[in-house]
Regions:
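Conserved ABC ATPase signature
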Residues: 151-156, 160
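A short, flexible loop at the N-terminus of ABC-type nucleotide-binding domains that lies
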Residues: 2-5, 14-27, 58-64, 81-84, ...
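A short, proline-enriched helix->beta-strand linker immediately N-terminal to the Walker B motif
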Residues: 171-175
Length: 207
C-alpha cells in the first residue's frame, strides 16, 4: 500500500558479552514512509547496523530487544510467527548487507541464489524465476548475465558480488529496502556507480 509506514519506536538493544551487558542501541526512534529515502548517520559502533538487523529480525543470539518496538502499519513485526516473518521478509522488507562475500552462500551459483527466493516467496515456475533473475542482473548493469548465473560468489569481484546481492534483493520487489553500508569495501568509482544504481532502482520501484 502507498501509505505504508515502517516505524522504530524507542528501541533499546543490548548484547550479553564476557564483559557483561553492552548497550548497542538506546532509545532510537524513526519513521520511514514507502517511496522515501532516509539515511541513518552515526559513528562506527553507534548502532546503525544493529538497528537494521533488529528491523530484519536478525539479531545475533546474544542480542536482545530490551524495550521498544518495530512496526509496519502499527503492527509489531518483532512478535510475528516464523511463517509470518518469512512472508514479511520475503515480500515486504529486503536488505543489502555490508559484506556481500559473507552474505552470499559460496556453495551456490548466482542462479541458485536468485531463484531460491523467487520460487519460494513468489511461487514462480523455474522459467519465470529465471527471467526475473536475468532482468534483475541486467538492471544492475552486469555484463553477460547468462554466463554470470553459472558462477559462484568466490569467482566474482567485490563490486560484482555487491551488485548480485542488490539484484537478489531487488528481484523480490520489496516495499522497503535496507542498505547497510553497501559500498564499504569498494573503490570510490564503484561506490558512486552502485549508489546511483540503488537510487535509480528506488525511484523506479517506489521503494
Amino acid at each position: 500500500p502507498k501509505n505504508d509506514v515502517l516505524k522504530v519506536k524507542r528501541l533499546h538493544v543490548e548484547f550479553q558479552t564476557s564483559h557483561g551487558m553492552v548497550h548497542a542501541v538506546k532509545d532510537v526512534s524513526l519513521e520511514v514512509k514507502r517511496g522515501r529515502i532516509h539515511a541513518l548517520v552515526g559513528e562506527s559502533g553507534s548502532g546503525k547496523s544493529v538497528t537494521s538487523l533488529t528491523i530484519m529480525n536478525l539479531l545475533a543470539g546474544n542480542g536482545k530487544v530490551i524495550s521498544g518496538d518495530v512496526t509496519l502499519n502499527e503492527k509489531s513485526i518483532l512478535k510475528l510467527s516464523g511463517k509470518e516473518k518469512r512472508q514479511l521478509y520475503g515480500d515486504r522488507i529486503g536488505m543489502i548487507f555490508q559484506d556481500p562475500t559473507a552474505a552470499l552462500d559460496p556453495l551456490f551459483t548466482v542462479e541458485q541464489l536468485l531463484l531460491e527466493g523467487l520460487r519460494k516467496h513468489h511461487r514462480m515456475s523455474k522459467k519465470q524465476a529465471r527471467e526475473v533473475a536475468l532482468e534483475s542482473l541486467r538492471m544492475m548493469n552486469l555484463r553477460d548475465p547468462e554466463e554470470l548465473m553459472k558462477k559462484k560468489p568466490y569467482e566474482l569481484s567485490g563490486g560484482m558480488c555487491q551488485r548480485v546481492m542488490i539484484a537478489i534483493a531487488m528481484s523480490m520487489k520489496p516495499d522497503y529496502l535496507i542498505a547497510d553500508e553497501p559500498t564499504t569495501a569498494l573503490d570510490v568509482t564503484v561506490q558512486k556507480q552502485i549508489l546511483e544504481e540503488i537510487y535509480q532502482l528506488s525511484r523506479k520501484e517506489n521503494l
